[in-house]
Structure formats: structure tokens, C-alpha cells
Amino acid sequence: MMRTLGHIVSRDVLLAIRRRADVATTLFFFVIVASLFPLGMGPDPKLLRAMAPGILWVAALLASMLSLGRLFDADYADGSLEQLMLVPEPLALVVIGKVMAHWLISGLPLVLIAPVIALQFDLPAGSLGTLLLALLLGTPLLSLIGAIGAALTVGVRGGGVLVSLLVLPLYVPVLIFGAGAVDASATGMDASGHLSILGALLLLGMVLAPWATAAALRISLE
């Protein structure tokens, strides 16, 4: 079972490496969106610090959503998705592997570059660690939730818009508690409550989302 999971993750990561432009698009989108706000809001440090948590999280959310179309569409187009559904292991395990690969390709680079981007918002140095931890908890959850929407729209023309409508309402709790953790840390308050809720949501998503995504894939491919 673990060997199958490893094969799926390595396969998707290798395919993504061959399509470097797609991977870079997500990262550049995050950097550009987050960098436009300081240019438009002016150099006021207090305003930048106050707006930074929400801006960084919205940019990460939109960048994550931008890459959801690559989760299943390529495999559906070349017929390999149907072959993956025939493996003896549960389809939920296949979903977990693909979500892990998606996060390694799209989510982890955002997590690593976010503290650097946060410097232009004059965030306190102590808040950068909280930002990193919040994104480490929140971005996998974005991938898990997004996988459900991506599975429901496999093979649908214009599915990207439909995915956005499906997953954006479900992203709201992640946005609230992720930005809240960074804001609490920046203002000298305790961010552990927000981080604990993010961790609980991630655990819940890890348990439920793969099965929901597997069911959505079966419905879409029937």
C-alpha cells in the first residue's frame, strides 16, 4: 500500500518537473498578487502590517486554487485516471497520493517563499514563524478541499470557474483562522488557538476529504 502511494507521489512530481512552466505560474501568481498591494496601498508601515495577514492568505488561497485544474485533468485527458481507479488499493489512497504531490508542487513553494514576501509588509520577525506554521497547516487543507471540487468537475468544459464556485465557500474557515493566527502574533497576542483549530481542520480533512474525492471521481467518470 505504501509502495503504491510512493509511486503515485513520485509519478506526479516527476510529471510536474517536466512541466516547469505550470509550476512556476502558481508561484509567480502568488508573488505578483502579494506584491501589488504594497504598491497600491502606499508606504504606511502600520497599514501594511494590519493588512498583511489577510493579503498573504488571500494570495496563497488564489494561487492554490489556480493549480487545482492540474490535479486530475491531465490524467483524465490521457486515460490514466481510469487506470488508476483499477488499482487494487482503495481509490482514496490514490487521491491521497495525488493530493500530496499537488501540495509538494504547489503548496510547499508558497510556504517557503511567503516569509520573504512578508518582509515587504513590515511584519515583525516573530510573526514570520507563525506565518510559516499557519501555511504549513493551511495549505495542505486547501489542497484536500480543492481535490473534492476538482474531482466533481473532471471532464467538464469550463470546469475551472465551477471549481472556484465550489471550493471558495469551503476555503473561508482556513482563511479566517490562518490570517487570524498571523494577525494575533503580529499584535502580540497568543496565536495557539487559531493554529490548534487549523490543525484540527487539517486532521478532519485528511480523514474525510480523500473518501469524498474518491466518491466524486466515481460519479464524474460514470
Language model features: what each stretch is:
Residues 206-222:
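Junction motif at the cytosolic side of a transmembrane helix
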Residues 129, 134-168, 218-222:
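A structural motif at transmembrane helix-loop-helix junctions in multipass membrane proteins
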Residues 40-51, 115-136, 154, 181-196, ...:
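Membrane-interfacial helix-loop-helix connectors in multipass membrane proteins
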Residues 65-85, 99:
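Transmembrane helix boundary and interhelical loop/hinge segments in multi-pass membrane proteins
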